[in-house]
Amino acid sequence: MSKIVIIGAGAMGSAFALPCLDNKHDINIVGTHLEDKFIDSLKKDNNLHPGLNTKIPKEIKIFKFEKIKELLNSEVELIVLGISSKGIEWAADQLSKLYNSKNIPKLLMLTKGLSIYNNHYELLVDKLERLLKEKGISQINISAVGGPCLAAGLANRVHSSVVIANKEIQTARKIADMLNTNYYHTSHSNDLNGVEVSAAIKNIFSMAVGAAKGLCSNNVSNEVREKNYLNTASALIKQSIYEMEIFVEHLKGKKETVKGLAGLGDLYVSSGGGRNARMGSYIGEGLTFSEAKKTKMEKVTVEGADLAIEIEKKINEDFDEKTLPLMLAMINAITKDKKLELNWDLFR
């Protein structure tokens, strides 16, 4: 049995506690400084998590932020970061107050992200490592989880397959073995870049696949589109995988990772009706991004759109329309706030 501390009481952090519990680990969730009222409400409602619509088992210990120092000062084998990408600076600050290079436990990130730093692409795992090194912690072992695993499904223990990635294959294997259950099926990989890049950019491509219904034909009725758009969706998925392979290799990942759980698997789930696919469907119908955001998804975070805005300048410097026709069309539709138009002749 190992002691695991999950930082963040959101949907995925809380759901992730289930396979940890079922492996007989000492599992603890500690909220961020922004989640105190949420945790009070959660406990008042008998551990019914509103983001999961299911109860968190009582055996999973849930603490408010005030307990973070006490929890992390104990014998912790694995710290799981279930915070938003915007909370990475905060997390690095908290960890640097408690640990040094000699005693920091292994870290596992549930959060995905890609940004631009000094005109270079920077994955969220790399950003965390950079921030910790800036604070004097140089020996850091960070793993990440990739693959098609929605939080509500995991919380209800439905069969789910994921990949644990770490640059050191032995560490990836060990953590995968720690978490594997009869419903949470874990594999392992040393292609941390490939897994993380796939996980981030699939949000852009799931918008493109989500647009299939509107894009399938200009000459048929909405009723016909509704029944016959899957041909188009399949073509867009195939092109998405082709372009994801190019981009993953550009960021020093392995192209074969794209056809695994972190790429194709996650794209399939995300294209099935998540926030990115919803935004794509509105854009496919002919709305611009700003129109869709204002009228349909005003208060909803669309990760693919946020990423498109973040990397637009850099990706247009690095690639042309002939190389990444679908990705650039989607990104430029978002950032230039224009209707989505695809050049099918450029597809492979």
PLM feature spans:
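General beta-strand structural signal in soluble alpha/beta enzymes
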Residues: 109, 140-146, 186-190, 259, ...
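NAD(P)+-binding Rossmann beta1-loop-alpha1 motif at the extreme N-terminus of oxidoreductases
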Residues: 1-56, 60-66, 70, 117
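Internal alpha-helical scaffold of NAD(P)-dependent oxidoreductase catalytic cores
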Residues: 98, 131-141, 159-256
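NAD(P)-dependent Rossmann-like dehydrogenase/reductase catalytic/cofactor-binding core
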Residues: 202, 209-213, 217, 227, ...
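Rossmann-like NAD(P)(H) cofactor-binding subdomain of soluble oxidoreductases
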Residues: 59-69, 73-157, 175
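Short beta-strand/turn micro-motifs composed of small residues
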Residues: 8, 31, 109-111, 146, ...
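Glycine-rich, N-terminal phosphate-binding loop of Rossmann-like dinucleotide-binding domains
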Residues: 9, 82-84, 272
